[in-house]
Structure formats: C-alpha cells, structure tokens
C-alpha cells in the first residue's frame, strides 16, 4: 500500500533507485521541495532526515523511511476500519489521507456513511458513531459499491477546492488511479 501511495505522489519513483527530491509547483502550499509527497514545508524534520539519507547515498534506508512514514502517517485509517479485512477501502482512504489530510478524509468517509445512515454529522472527526456506521456498512460485504461512493465523494471534494483550476486534472487522475488500485485489492 505504502509503495503505491508513494508512486501516486511521484510517478517517476518506483523504488529506492529512483527516489528523488523534487521541486514543488509554486502554487503548492506544501513548501518548496518534496520526496514523494513528504514536503519540506509540512514535515520538515522527516523531509530533512530523508534528504540527508539520499545525500549520503543510503537510498534503501531512505525508501524504507518513506514507506514507514506513509504507514505511520495514515495508521488512523486502519483504526477506523478495525482490521485488515477491507484492503481496497483501506488503501483508498489511506491514499486520500496522505494526500489531503485526516479531516478531509474523515469528511468524505462520513458523507458516504451518511448516505446509508442519515443523521451522521459530517465534521471530519471519526468518532464512535462514525466507526459504528462504518463497521455496519462494511459488514454488508459490498466493498466495490462502497469504493464507488468513496470515489464520488473524493472527486467532489477535489472539485470544491480553491486550487482545483490549477491542480484538479492531476487530483482527479490520482483519484481514478487510486480507485483502480483499490478495486484490484477489493
């Protein structure tokens, strides 16, 4: 999962040998530089540690550091789901979490859950009620339909962003790519 998320962040990176530092677009609010979505403006300590490893030629260690960071950064998704029984849904949510943050991921999930369990507050905080609704939805066993709903809400989220005119085409492509990968796991 983590390797796929890193590839979605930088399609030229396929593993340790191709791991690189890239300049962010001027309109990106993550800073000036990134390593597969790990930005100097958002995670400076992690970025600097990984860059130091790359500068020292420790590419394998830098790659492992990136993978572990993605897993640690998105671990809340596994806690929401409660098990590894729904890898496609877990992947899709982890990818969005890494790309857009916990609150935005919580909101798209809650919008999907509210569709089936009306009355859920959409605040981006996955608390006991959201988890109960999620577990109920997952117990129905239709992960592909749930993924369809998540994809729809993720695309709607991207379209609502102020920076959609600048980054929207790439965001929607990533959403589609993540959806395809998630379906292969479901």
Could you describe each region identified by the protein language model?
Residues 1-186:
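Cell-wall polysaccharide-cleaving catalytic domain and substrate-binding groove, primarily
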